[in-house]
Amino acid sequence: MLSYTSCAKLICSRYIVSKISFYSLKRCNSTAVVRTRFAPSPTGFLHLGSLRTALFNYLWAKKSNGKFILRLEDTDQKRKVTGSDLEIYKVLKQFNLQWDEGPIVGGPYGPYEQSSRLQIYQKYAQHLIETGRAYVSYSVPIATTKIDSSTKYHEISIDDLTDAQRKLYKSKKFPYVVRFRMKEPSPFTDLVYGKIAIKSDSREIEESNNFVILKSDGFPTYHFANVVDDHLMHITHVIRGEEWVPSTIKHIQLYEAFGWKPPKFAHLPLLVNPDGSKLSKRQNDAHVSSLLQEGFLPEAILNFIALMGWSSRQKSDFLPMKELIDLFSIDKLTKSSSIVAFEKLYFLNKNYLRRAISDVNRLDELIELVQPRLIQKFSHSSRSHDKSYTKKLLLLLKNKVHTIKEFEKIVFYFYEASDLQQIRSLVSSLITVEELPKILTTILNKFETIEWNTHEIQISLKEIAMEHQMPLKKIQSLLRYGLCGNLPGGGISDTISLLGKETVKSRLERLLLSLKHELPKRSCIV
């Protein structure tokens, strides 16, 4: 049987590593400063659950005057998606979850991308082998004369090899991994769930037995890199999803093997659909980028996910970032699964939109967000490029819309005329076909003579209603249908004023002509 030191030399023969020196086995300069981390894998779109994890880590760091660290866990090269790292950075910045240390900004404990830390992990794997807590395990081909893609392998520990076999396997360059020797797991304390003990006969224990810490390609597994990095980066609190509870027994034993003090663990409850099923990463509406594209504001989404698994104990669910930081506490995290009810998100977003539109500074930011969407959708209209016009639309419709995408839909009639057949059907349900031409003619004549503003338009509508002995509401509905179709909007006088005199005249004349069986061949577009 080989000594542990001989086993460790195998790693040295494959990788250029040196004795652990700078990366001391003891935590350097232990500090009471709270340090949390968000450690996503660049394997695709950021999920709602991941964003919640980032938020809670950010909130706890800021509440405690600590540091929020971003670390990219990119050791799974097969699942890595090109560009996902940039998408993660972009989304976090969109949500103003700015990291204090990490990629781009740097920091004292970098690099912050795990693929750039391979030698560090190999040094620590070497140490575990030397102390007997890890061992090399070869993948040996099952008796065959030719090795190809169909060849089957079985694992054999280097402890069970003779010197001759070790030399043979090394000369043939058989792949091998490094495995960690697990001991009987002990209960651990979680800040959310309290004392957790996993039964010795459970599936989690079986899957944890002597798990791989260094893969055949030289990359560490998630569990190993996670522990090494959390220690070296002085992480004090690990706040992550409930699905990582079974893995914590592996992590704690790794800490113990190195003689390190583990950080405090807080596991967040699962996110579930209203039917109780687990929220899947494959669900499009669970992707953060999809929600942004749908026109939800970042601050509304953050408020929404903050209420999942955490109790603010406030009367209002409306909690902007400053209040979230002030109120957040780990002891208010809940144990039960959190239902993702998007109705709440619509409610919150409507309130955030209304507040943003009412705030002079935020309104300008909102215009910058909305304008490109309008230009793309209504590129044929010069109005889509007019920021002052967009501002007026936002102010007019601030109480009507839940999302920016809904705003895009509602403002359609400010850029294009609605379907004429639909309009005729709508107005005919209000007023007889015989009366309509007379009323439309009166409206056109009246509008031709007035000064174009909301006040004058209101007076004109009252006069028209009196002249035709009709309720004012009926005249207002006639104009709403005739100018806007069946889309909702602001006050009709404000809407008419904002549409503009020429547009109103053009659309009413088109409707009048159609009633006289003189329908234009093409719809009017403004």
UniProtKB/Swiss-Prot annotation:
Residue interval(s) of motif 'KMSKS' region: 278-282
Binding site residues for ATP: 47, 243, 278-282
GO annotation terms (biological process): glutamyl-tRNA aminoacylation; mitochondrial translation
Reaction equation(s) it catalyzes: tRNA(Glu) + L-glutamate + ATP = L-glutamyl-tRNA(Glu) + AMP + diphosphate
EC assignment: 6.1.1.17
Boundaries of the annotated transit peptide in chain numbering: 1-38
Subcellular location: Mitochondrion
Binding residues annotated for L-glutamate, in chain numbering: 37-39, 73, 222-226, 240
GO cellular component annotations of the record: mitochondrial matrix; mitochondrion
Domain of life: Eukaryota
Keywords associated with the record: Aminoacyl-tRNA synthetase, ATP-binding, Ligase, Mitochondrion, Nucleotide-binding, Protein biosynthesis, RNA-binding, Transit peptide
EC class: ligase
Broad class of where this protein is predominantly found: mitochondrion
Xref: InterPro entries: aa-tRNA-synth_I_cd-bd, aa-tRNA-synth_I_codon-bd_sub2, aa_tRNA-synth_I_cd-bd_sf, Glu-tRNA-ligase_bac/mito, Glu/Gln-tRNA-synth, Glu/Gln-tRNA-synth_Ib_cat-dom, GluQ/Sye, GluRS_core
GO MF terms, alphabetically ordered: ATP binding; glutamate-tRNA ligase activity; tRNA binding; zinc ion binding
Annotated motif 'HIGH' region, positions: 42-50
Similarity section: Belongs to the class-I aminoacyl-tRNA synthetase family. Glutamate--tRNA ligase type 1 subfamily.
UniProt function note: Catalyzes the attachment of glutamate to tRNA(Glu) in a two-step reaction: glutamate is first activated by ATP to form Glu-AMP and then transferred to the acceptor end of tRNA(Glu).
HAMAP family: Glu_tRNA_synth_type1 (MF_00022)
Protein name according to UniProt: Glutamate--tRNA ligase, mitochondrial
Species for this entry: Schizosaccharomyces pombe (strain 972 / ATCC 24843)
Name of the gene: mse1
